[in-house]
Amino acid sequence: MARDLIGPALPPGFKARGTAEDEERDPSPVAGPALPPNYKSSSSDSSDSDEDSSSLYEEGNQESEEDDSGPTARKQRKNQDDDDDDDDGFFGPALPPGFKKQDDSPPRPIIGPALPPGFIKSTQKSDKGRDDPGQQETDSSEDEDIIGPMPAKGPVNYNVTTEFEKRAQRMKEKLTKGDDDSSKPIVRESWMTELPPEMKDFGLGPRTFKRRADDTSGDRSIWTDTPADRERKAKETQEARKSSSKKDEEHILSGRDKRLAEQVSSYNESKRSESLMDIHHKKLKSKAAEDKNKPQERIPFDRDKDLKVNRFDEAQKKALIKKSRELNTRFSHGKGNMFL
């Protein structure tokens, strides 16, 4: 409002000089580039209040005009307002018609496998949670209250008769399969009948070089052999012995070797005396025959004889004699080509 003046009024055609406050309210013309449309200059609170009052006055006039023009004018005004909202914050030339306007921040290209259909990115989920945090809290509280399996979402088709029929069919299949399986022999798996592989000493073995190249362990199959396996192995050993004896018999002496052997034996009998071993055996046999014929008498106790201390038993004695007899085979001539 203009201040009430005291004194004579100015004649018509002359403009009254305003005060300092009026000069602040009325913006002076700006020298230089002006701001683009839809942008407001930073002004004081008084200018904001004046603009608010003027905008209210303009809105009232617009409403009155809309009432006068009818619904068509309202629709045009609404479309114009929407266009103004879309154009806010846009600088530069506008896109031609038919082109889609891009967002302010286009999404970055995804590096790696894409998400399957129906899944949402974590960023979108977080944005949704920020938009309505109240709804997110209610959803989480509802999920915490639920205990146990969720009810079925779709319709449940359950029939007692169909369930009984399915069960009977399963039992029938089981029985028929069992008859087929009974004819097959039951065989245990390999891990039940075989020993596991030998475990090496992880850092606990001897820290020396091997003395023998073929340092192999014995036959470990005796731990898992069944009676049938033992019988089969015994038969194999017997057959191997028979084959070795047959090979020895195959070395038949030739006629020349036989003739020379007879000549050597006749020469030894006529020219050479008996060996010490044969003489010793003859003495033992004669002594044993004399001891049998002697009458038995009471003998005083002899510790070495009666307790048989430091003496060979019969088994050791027979083994030693048998081993001594093999000296002739070890250091004698071969069975073939006896004579040069």
UniProtKB/Swiss-Prot annotation:
Any idea which residues bear N-acetylalanine here? Answer: 2
Keywords, in A-Z order? Acetylation, Isopeptide bond, Phosphoprotein, Ubl conjugation
Instruction: List the biased-composition ranges (Basic and acidic residues).
Output: 124-133, 163-187, 227-261, 269-279, 287-304
- Cross-referenced Pfam families, in alphabetical order? DUF3752 (PF12572)
Q: What InterPro entries does its record include?
A: DUF3752, GPAM1-like
- Domain of life per record: Eukaryota
Positions carrying Phosphoserine = 28, 105, 140-141
Keyword hit for Glycoprotein: no
> What protein is this chain from?
GPALPP motifs-containing protein 1
The organism named in the record is Homo sapiens (Human)
